[in-house]
Design a protein with these regions (language model features):
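Acidic, glycine-rich flexible loop/linker segments
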Residues: 11-12, 18, 22-27, 59-105, ...
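ATP-dependent carboxylate activation and anion-phosphoryl transfer catalytic cores
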Residues: 1-50
């Protein structure tokens, strides 16, 4: 199997292959792999009573991710926030153990952004869930999520409007394509 990116000429209608590569981990993974999730009856009842659907998009993978929302408009914002925290730490304004601040991305956090590029990969590898406003099954976010076995929801147009920094969310890719 191959991941093939193509472009269509808007005037002539001609199709062009712009990139082709062997499919990443998805094709190589065992079709018989089963992920098992267990929730207590109390948690299930709580979710049924209070849980609500915040946004939808295209599911990538078959896993469920949960964590604190870390929202970024662009990768430049990631760099600016990281530098601000490093400066405050160096100046003694922040304690090392107080890095729950919304500017710091921690292992298992939920990455929420417009779209990803290769610059995002260090954060993506640490993510418990990736949510992008733009993209589809062949987008950078989807390919990297499959490669690292991280659940992702791409093309989730409402995410940046309804999610808030540090909000605890759960995203399920185990229930189908959307």
């Amino acid at each position: 199997p191959m991941d093939i990116e193509w472009a269509k000429d808007g005037i002539t209608g001609d199709l062009f292959i712009v990139q082709a590569r062997p499919e990443t981990v998805h094709a190589n993974s065992s079709a018989s792999e089963i992920m098992r999730y267990t929730m207590s009856a109390e948690l299930i009842n709580d979710l049924r009573r209070s849980g609500k659907l915040l946004a939808t998009g295209q599911a990538v993978g078959k896993r469920i991710g949960t964590g604190r929302v870390r929202m970024y408009e662009s990768y430049d914002e990631v760099i600016r926030r990281k530098r601000a925290v490093q400066k405050r730490l160096a100046e003694g304004e922040l304690e090392e153990d107080l890095l729950l601040d919304e500017r710091v991305f921690e292992q298992g956090d939920v990455l929420v952004t417009e779209m990803t590029t290769p610059d995002w990969e260090p954060l993506m590898k640490k993510s418990g869930l990736i949510i992008t406003r733009k993209g589809g099954r062949t987008s950078h976010a989807a390919i990297i999520a499959r490669e690292f076995g991280i659940p992702a929801i791409v093309g989730c147009t409402g995410a940046m409007r309804v999610l808030e920094p540090l909000m605890e969310v759960t995203g399920s890719c185990a229930e189908g394509d959307e």
